[in-house]
């Protein structure tokens, strides 16, 4: 019976808290199976457009689990392409309105616990390897905001409302 549940992506859920800077995995009974520190988007608030450096909030699903060991990334800091920027894996999420958002490893373990990414959810590489062992396409990922994200979103909505009424 447990083996059958292990094969169902919906039998587990990943919950990412931008408030606690934690990624937790729960089973269908609500038992916490894993708990890791993360880094998330540099900017506060809900993701509204590509390049805003925000981690999207809401319910998403794992699309693919990809080998990222040979991938590089240019962080725009003058150092050029960084080998291993994504760690060993990239767990691609289905995030409508955004592309390239996922859960991945890091070349910079000291960034965990900070707002350091361009929107992705970053883990230590050992934690990511453990997480990948149970992740399956179709698995649900819930990303929840921090209080600061919520306040930033309220300002964003207020500014948009004001700009529409002042036209």
Which residue stretches match the model-derived regions?
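Structural signal for conserved beta-strand scaffold positions within catalytic alpha/beta enzyme cores
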Residues: 37, 64, 122, 142-143
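Short, surface-exposed beta-strand-loop junctions and turns on beta-sheet-rich folds
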Residues: 29-34, 109-110, 138
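N-terminal targeting pre-sequences for secretion and organelle import
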Residues: 127-167
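Gly/Pro-biased beta-strand-loop elements
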Residues: 1-101, 149-151, 157-162
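Active-site scaffold segments
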Residues: 89-94, 100-134, 140-142
